[in-house]
């Protein structure tokens, strides 16, 4: 359009190359570099992830205990059956809006079906055993105006009557166990992001299940991030498995046993962490490399 400047915000390299004459690369709110288009794609990806730790060392050792494989039906993505052992942490990584958060939602709404082997029979995991926490903590995960004790009452109430004495004791125990910085009467909207996330985790039933967590540490400071992962890692020892989405390469590398990479709402790679290098991930999520 003559006389106008159009600013396109995108994470899709194909789109930028097709529509733009130059591109400015941003990361965490800071300008990295402005470049002319066309430009070598590999160099753009390197600039996009400049400053990420490049150590390939695996931080969380993979358990050598043999577990039965889960079967993850990926026909929605025109893939076959992915086989991953139970008890694993599966990180689902992609740039913002690439489809990795939607993957977690699809596990919860059963668009992606997962089965496990019990007594030689393959059984589908029931929705009641899938414990989902959304990334929009106040919008979708919690009731902003309800207090901590009211959240606990809704979570624990198994019938039409609430025993407030028991709920008060239970709530105090959970607040202490998850180190939530708030009182029984604190509203969810009054909590920090880290404490809102810990409140979400505290509401997950104690029964064994499959954890499906969107962006577990988005927007959290270092201490809150570590605290949240400590609670998740305590829990996963006894659960079926954990699926979590993230846009952070360091987080997916540090916390995953298996990694599913997304670009443009498509799966570009599914690998056990020991079979790839950390440096591969940036190319998987930018769509430059697939397997």
Label each region the model flagged.
Residues 1-291:
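Glycine-rich phosphate-binding loops of nucleotide-dependent enzymes
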């Amino acid at each position: 359009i003559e006389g106008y400047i159009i600013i396109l915000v995108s994470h899709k390299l194909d789109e930028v190359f097709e529509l733009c004459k130059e591109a400015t690369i941003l990361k965490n709110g800071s300008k990295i570099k402005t470049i002319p288009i066309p430009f070598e794609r590999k160099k753009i990806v390197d600039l996009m992830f400049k400053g990420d730790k490049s150590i390939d060392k695996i931080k969380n050792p993979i358990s050598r205990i043999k577990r039965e494989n889960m079967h993850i039906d990926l026909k929605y993505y025109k893939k076959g059956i992915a086989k991953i052992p139970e008890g694993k942490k599966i990180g689902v990584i992609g740039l913002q809006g690439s489809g990795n958060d939607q993957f977690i939602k699809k596990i919860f709404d059963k668009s992606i079906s997962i089965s496990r082997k019990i007594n030689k029979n393959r059984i589908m995991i029931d929705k009641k055993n899938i414990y989902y926490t959304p990334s929009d903590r106040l919008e979708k995960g919690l009731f902003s105006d309800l207090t901590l004790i009211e959240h606990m009452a809704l979570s624990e109430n198994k019938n039409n009557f609430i025993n407030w004495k028991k709920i008060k004791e239970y709530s105090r125990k959970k607040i202490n166990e998850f180190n939530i910085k708030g009182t029984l009467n604190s509203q969810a909207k009054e909590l920090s992001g880290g404490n809102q996330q810990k409140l979400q985790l505290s509401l997950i039933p104690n029964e064994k299940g499959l954890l499906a967590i969107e962006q577990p540490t988005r927007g959290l400071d270092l201490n809150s991030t570590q605290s949240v992962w400590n609670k998740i890692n305590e829990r996963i020892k006894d659960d079926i498995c954990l699926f979590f989405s993230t846009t952070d390469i360091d987080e997916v590398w540090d916390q995953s046993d298996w990694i599913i990479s997304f670009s443009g709402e498509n799966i570009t790679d599914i690998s056990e962490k020991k079979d790839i290098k950390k440096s591969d991930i940036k190319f998987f999520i930018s769509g430059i490399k697939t397997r």
